[in-house]
Amino acid sequence: MDTSDQYYRAIKKIKEASDSSNKAYLTSSKLANMLGLSQQSASRIIIDLEKLGYITRTVSKRGQLLTITEKGLDLLYTEFAELSRILSIKSNIVMTGIVVPGMGEGKYYISRKQYIIQFQEKLGIIPYLGTLNIKVDPSSIPELRKLRGFTGIHIEGFRTEDRTFGSVKAFRCKTNGVPSFLIMPERTVYTDVVEIISDKYLRNELNLKDGDEVTIEVTA
C-alpha cells in the first residue's frame, strides 16, 4: 500500500471516529488498531497528515485531539466523486444561501476573451459580464464539499503578458429554477461563497437583492 492510500485510510478512520465538527480524540495506538498498523507507523502518519494540512492536532489533559481540515475533507469527497464517476452515479446537489455583494472581480474575470470563447463553446452561452455571488448556508456546506470533489466542465486557464488566469470548472445548475452555471477555480479555494453565471442578469431576472435567499440545484 502506498503512502497516499495510507493517508486516505487514516483520514477515513479519523472521520468515522469524529463528531459532527470533524474532531476526534484518538491516540496513535488506537488509530494503529483501527488501521492494522504498528503504533510507530500510526504516529508517523498523524505527523505527516498534520504537516500536509489534512488535520490539526492539539494535546490536552483529555488526550490528543485530531481535527480534519477542509483539505482533509476534500480528500474524502474527491474519492466519493471518483467512485460516483466510475459507477455512473449522478449526484443531485441542492444548496441554499443568500445573495451577497461582489467586489467586481467576477466581471473582470468573466470578461476575458479567452474565457468567453470557452464559455460559448463548452457551456453554450455568452455570459452576462458579472457573477451572482451566493454565501452558502452552513447547513449546505457538506453539499458544497461534495461538489468540490467533482471535475465539472473544464475551462482552461491562460496567461497574458502581466498575469496568469487559472483553470475553472463549471457545473450546470438551476438558480431559483433558472438555468445557469456554478463556477469555481479548479485549484481549490476554501470559501463559503459560490459564483453563478448565466446569459441573463440574474439579479434582474429573479428580482434579487443582497440578503435574499437562493436555492441552487446542481447535477454533478
UniProtKB/Swiss-Prot annotation:
Residues given in the record as Mg(2+) binding sites: T131, N133
Q: Name the Gene Ontology biological process terms.
A: FMN biosynthetic process; riboflavin biosynthetic process
The record's region (Riboflavin kinase) falls at: 93-220
Show the segment(s) annotated as H-T-H motif-like: 1-92
Instruction: Give binding positions for CDP.
Output: G102, M103, G104, E105, G106, K107, K200, Y201, L202, R203
Q: Which family does it belong to?
A: Belongs to the archaeal riboflavin kinase family.
Q: What is this protein called?
A: Riboflavin kinase
Which organism is this entry from? Thermoplasma volcanium (strain ATCC 51530 / DSM 4299 / JCM 9571 / NBRC 15438 / GSS1)
Taxonomic lineage is: Archaea, Methanobacteriati, Thermoplasmatota, Thermoplasmata, Thermoplasmatales
